[in-house]
Design a protein with these regions (language model features):
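Short acidic/glycine-rich loops and adjacent helix/strand connectors
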Residues: 6-204
Length: 204
């Protein structure tokens, strides 16, 4: 995130991912990870959507952040949910923390966060980056070009056209939990007869 935020001096950044499955935080100092943890390890609630005091306190024991980096644009996500007949999305738990209230915050698009996580932790100086998931704010598929310290979007596709949601639907169809057990479904695929339903799925 130090590269993403354009920081060249020593800085401590708290990266936060929540209000979705598997909430997590990461604390970085000058781009080096000091702490990273999932909320579920502290709350004992599988796939916990929210951070909690124990997790945040543990992260802050490694240093006080100069800035908070949030993994999506909440107002865009809220707009998408409302336009689809929902109620607007949840409030992140970390906003309840008085000690984080005045820390400068910066949000990044959901798919940019995916792209950055893959590219900036790789050993490549340039790369084509493909993001496929269920849904970000609106994006479901995106292609990026990484060059040096820069990432720029090339092409995007928006909800409801989503390979990730399509895959999760099949995960649920075979009796597994969507947004959790897709990896089991993927592993099972190697033992099945792919031709059995291929034409039906292709027609869809």
């Amino acid at each position: 995130y130090s590269r993403v935020l354009g920081k060249t001096t020593m800085s401590i950044i708290l990266g936060i991912n929540e209000t979705t499955h598997d909430a997590s935080v990461t604390l970085l100092k000058d781009g080096k990870i000091l702490f990273a943890g999932h909320a579920e390890r502290f709350s004992k609630q599988k796939n916990d959507w929210y951070t909690n005091d124990e997790l945040i306190d543990h992260a802050l024991s490694y240093g006080e952040p100069d800035r908070i980096a949030y993994y999506e644009h909440r107002w865009l996500k809220k707009a998408r949910i409302i336009t689809r007949g929902g109620f607007g999305g949840e409030k992140p738990y970390y906003l309840n923390r008085a000690d984080l209230k005045w820390v400068p915050r910066e949000s990044f698009s959901h798919h940019y966060s995916h792209a950055a996580a893959g590219y900036y932790t790789s050993k490549f100086d340039d790369a084509v980056i493909v993001v496929l998931d269920a849904i970000g704010e609106f994006n479901t598929t995106s292609i990026w070009i990484g060059e040096g310290s820069n990432i720029k979007p090339v092409k995007k596709r928006n909800y409801p056209f989503s390979f990730g949601l399509f895959y999760s639907a099949f995960t649920q169809l075979v009796g597994l939990r969507p947004n959790e057990e897709e990896y089991i479904f993927m592993g099972m695929a190697a033992y099945g007869d792919w031709t059995r339903y291929y034409l039906k799925v292709k027609e869809y």
